[in-house]
Design a protein with these regions (language model features):
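Conserved beta-strand positions in the central sheet of alpha/beta enzyme cores
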Residues: 1, 23-25, 51, 89, ...
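Glycine-rich, proline-tolerant flexible connector loops at the mouths of alpha/beta enzymes
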Residues: 1-15
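Active-site-proximal loop/turn and secondary-structure-junction residues that shape catalytic pockets
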Residues: 2-3, 27-30, 56-58, 94-96, ...
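Short, acidic/polar
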Residues: 6-9, 32-42, 128-136, 178-181
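Active-site acidic/histidine proton-transfer and metal-coordination neighborhood
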Residues: 8, 20, 28-118, 203
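Conserved, mostly hydrophobic/aromatic
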Residues: 14, 42, 88, 121, ...
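Acidic/histidine-rich catalytic cores of soluble enzymes
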Residues: 81-175
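C-terminal helical cap(s) of enzyme catalytic domains, especially alpha/beta-barrels
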Residues: 202-219
């Protein structure tokens, strides 16, 4: 998202303020229809990762056919990106944790991922009914980045991939074990962890979240 600016203008602004993008976003359709174009865009930004945050599906009906199609597209696009030194990462939103055979649809994705990894959004993992730390233990080599977003206490999750942005709270003040997740991810060599806050209180909350992260003792 370039906030309405032309890409060249946006990149100039990043350069002016010495902001170096680690990752850029790409839609499912972009990866399906023009993965080479996605790779070139990432190279223009100097990004090492491309993240896709949504697999299209009708309403709340996400199933194994959607999952298999996505895995095929991600593996194909990921191979093209990999040739340019770029890693493709999928950002799960919780609807992937529906039961499938002896696990979940997410398990199918993780076990068949040849050319893509995971950007773990700890809010959506939790909201979808899974435990981020358990998932890090189960797939230690699959996670390459984290979105750190805490969930207000008392909120009950589901696997729709939908929740009010106002349920985003200061890191460490919600129901998610942010400290434990950060420590586990650090132990596993995850280098990039991004604070994400989509609430209307973001300006006030992010400094507090950053202060909380700085208070975590990493050994």
């Amino acid at each position: 998202d370039t906030y309405g600016m032309e890409e060249s203008e946006f990149r100039s602004l990043l350069k002016k303020y010495e902001l170096n993008p680690i990752s850029i976003g790409a839609s499912y359709d972009e990866l399906k229809d023009d993965p080479k174009g996605v790779a070139q865009k990432a190279l223009r930004y100097g990004a090492r990762f491309v993240m896709c945050s949504w697999i299209p599906h009708k309403g709340n009906r996400f199933d194994i056919e959607n999952t298999k199609a996505a895995v095929k597209i991600f593996n194909k696009a990921g191979a093209i990106l990999k040739r340019e030194g770029i890693t493709l990462a999928y950002h799960a939103h919780g609807y992937e944790f529906r039961p499938h055979e002896y696990g979940t649809l997410f398990d199918y994705m993780a076990q068949n991922a040849k050319n893509f990894s995971l950007e773990m959004d700890v809010f959506w993992i939790t909201h979808g009914g899974e435990d981020p730390i358990s998932l890090l233990d189960k797939y230690p080599d699959f996670v390459v980045m984290l979105h750190l977003k805490d969930m207000e206490k008392g909120l009950k999750g589901n696997n729709t991939g939908s929740a009010s942005v106002e349920t985003n709270v200061v890191l460490g003040q919600g129901q998610i074990d942010i400290e434990g997740i950060v420590r586990k991810a650090h132990q596993q060599g995850v280098r990039y962890m991004f604070i994400e806050d989509e609430s209307s209180r973001v300006i006030n909350q992010v400094p507090k979240s950053l202060s909380f992260l700085r208070s975590i003792s990493i050994k």
